[in-house]
Amino acid sequence: MTEDKKVSVSMFIKELELEVVHKGENTDYEIISSDINRPALQFAGFFEHFAYDRVQVIGKGEHDYFGTLDRATRLRRLEKLFSYEIPVLVLARGLDFSSDTINMAKKYNRIIIRSQMSTTKFINKASGYLSEKLAPSKTVHGVLVDIYGIGVLLMGKSGVGKSETALELVKRGHRLVADDAVEIRRIEDDMLVGEAPDILKYLMEIRGVGILDIKNLYGVGAIRTNKVVEMVAELEYWEEGKYYDRLGIDEEYMTLLDVPVEKIVIPVKPGRNLAMIIEVAAKNYRQKNMGYNAAKIFNEKLLKKLSD
């Protein structure tokens, strides 16, 4: 299930350690976009297509330009600016707000804050923070493991052996990211990042044994806090008569948060070393990304042999 994310201005101020210049009592707004707006055009009097729902940042350029306007014009522009429900107005570089700006913020019950950082650094930091917090997300049932630098999401029905396979992978030197519940965020158009909920971080459940703390049992080298999800390995009980891919020519994909992720289906039956199979699958995935596809090369050789 996907979630619509919002960040309160109070949390934004706290996390980025910003100075509050004015914030009315019982006043808070929610930030819904990671994009930042610099209201230079608005200070010049152009309010068409004004992205008022974004964090508004004033740098030295806007600050100095605004100071060249006569007071009557400044008041009109401020009145117009604050008449929109902007979430917050930020002044970078430690610059000062004029008394007119503060009074107008009080009139419209808006929040104004200050950062000591340069404008560019503040925008980069604020945008990165908001992108992470506002990224589309969902929680899936599975186990996420870092195998040779490839984020592999193990999925399948409950009891099929996902956690046991992940434990064997950890013993083989790979790193656990999340067990049972994986929180996945789309931080870019085609990039998914998975992590464990705080309450489950570094923990694993093994039936018959109970809860294991992987960090304490195997050390910090056996865990990581998050990982890009690059491949899905779905474990399913072996079904006699069902076709399973034996060549690996046809690639299958699973869509997560509108992002296609390469998927392989691994049939589970006694005697199969699932950890080793998934380990090899991760190596093969990396090899294909480097331009070498063993299945396609074999197929080309076979077709050439048949045509001779």
UniProtKB/Swiss-Prot annotation:
Keyword Disulfide bond applies: no
Give the matching InterPro entries.
Answer: HPr(Ser)_kin/Pase (IPR003755), Hpr_kin/Pase_C (IPR011104), Hpr_kin/Pase_Hpr_N (IPR011126), P-loop_NTPase (IPR027417), Ser_kin/Pase_Hpr-like_N_sf (IPR028979)
Q: Where is the active site?
A: 141, 162, 180 (proton acceptor), 246
- UniProt GO BP: regulation of carbohydrate metabolic process
> Gene3D superfamilies this protein is in?
HprK N-terminal domain-like (3.40.1390.20), P-loop containing nucleotide triphosphate hydrolases (3.40.50.300)
* Catalytic activity entry: [HPr protein]-L-serine + ATP = [HPr protein]-O-phospho-L-serine + ADP + H(+); [HPr protein]-O-phospho-L-serine + phosphate + H(+) = [HPr protein]-L-serine + diphosphate
Positions of region (Important for the catalytic mechanism of dephosphorylation): 267-272
Q: Where does Mg(2+) bind?
A: 163, 205
Q: Which domain of life is it from?
A: Bacteria
- Needed cofactors: Mg(2+)
For this protein, what is the EC number? 2.7.11.-, 2.7.4.-
* Renumbered residue ranges of the record's region Important for the catalytic mechanism of both phosphorylation and dephosphorylation: 204-213
* Amino acids binding ATP: 156-163
The record's family statement is: Belongs to the HPrK/P family.
Q: How does it assemble?
A: Homohexamer.
Domain remarks in the Swiss-Prot or TrEMBL record = The Walker A ATP-binding motif also binds Pi and PPi.
Function noted in UniProt: Catalyzes the ATP- as well as the pyrophosphate-dependent phosphorylation of a specific serine residue in HPr, a phosphocarrier protein of the phosphoenolpyruvate-dependent sugar phosphotransferase system (PTS). HprK/P also catalyzes the pyrophosphate-producing, inorganic phosphate-dependent dephosphorylation (phosphorolysis) of seryl-phosphorylated HPr (P-Ser-HPr).
Q: Other remarks? A: Both phosphorylation and phosphorolysis are carried out by the same active site and suggest a common mechanism for both reactions.
What is the name attached to this protein's record?
HPr kinase/phosphorylase
